[in-house]
Amino acid sequence: MRIVVSFLSLFLPLYLLAQNGQARQPNVMVVPFVEPGEGENDRIKDAVLNDEAVPLALSKIKEEFNLRNFKTIDFMTEFQRVQNRAYAASALNAKSTGLQAYVDGARADIYVTVKISKEDFAGGASNVTLLMEAKERETGFSLANASIVSDRFRASKKELTEYALEGISENFFNQLKQAFRDMVTNGREVNITLNVDENCDFDMENDAVGTRDMTLSDELDEWVLENAFKGNGEVRSGGNGLNVYMRVPVYDPDTGRPCSIKSETGKLRRFASGLLKDKGYTVSEKAASGQYIQLLIQNSRE
């Protein structure tokens, strides 16, 4: 069996973490890979109900995580829940759809996508390639991936998948542990851009804000140094706006509860709005995708 395992450890997570002197593990959910976009929910349903290899792979990989004391969330249970009409109807109003809706709804810290491809050869033999990729839920950062190719057999896709699953490397799980430790130690990086609406007269470079006769850039610079995780952050001028780079914690240091990027960056937005309130301006969130947040300074509504 040919096994190729490669790992990508970017900024973020996967496995043990020390919180208030206690070990904590992330919740992991193994999900089927489907192409994102329109019709994604239908593709999920088709993969789960019409491809026997998919539920097998999800179950077996989940078992491997359980054997290594990871906390896991069963995707098939979540899938059945979504089939309930009441739940599905409420999910239609959710901002996230497709796989992201499952991951967000289950509150998984990490999700592992599994893609299974079957290739047929002359003579009737076939093999499967199994691709696994682990991602952090909020940012979507790729943390680890593995590619496993089964030997060639005269066998079904389900049987070949079972053979391939025997080749999961221990290094994959070790990498998850180390990456998660690194994430908890260093925090998650977020990039916040702050721009001025075209109908707003605020001069970001020259107008003083707050009570200390400082520019917004200087005020935010001090705030970031005080509030970013371990003081790790900076403010840069970029074009007609500001770029704020800062680290946010994975877990609240006092309660041990997960910290969402939205809640942490919301603190900065409210701080900036407070500085601009007396001038007749407010700061609102224009867009957000993972660790990228766009804020906009606008005229306050009367």
Tell me the role of every PLM-derived stretch.
Residues 39-106, 111, 214-252, 256-277:
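N-terminal segment of the mature soluble domain
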Residues 35-37, 78-82, 117-121, 150-154, ...:
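Solvent-exposed loop/turn segments at secondary-structure junctions
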Residues 20, 102-105, 122-124:
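Short, charge-rich binding segments
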Residues 110-154, 290-302:
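Amphipathic beta-strand/beta-sheet edge segments enriched in Tyr/Trp
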Residues 115-120, 231-237, 284-285:
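Short amphipathic beta-strand and strand-loop transition segments with alternating hydrophobic
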Residues 1-21:
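Bacterial Sec-dependent N-terminal signal peptides
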Residues 31-33:
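Short hydrophobic segments within beta-strands
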Residues 19-29, 38, 142-232, 267, ...:
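C-terminal/domain-edge helix-coil "capping" segments
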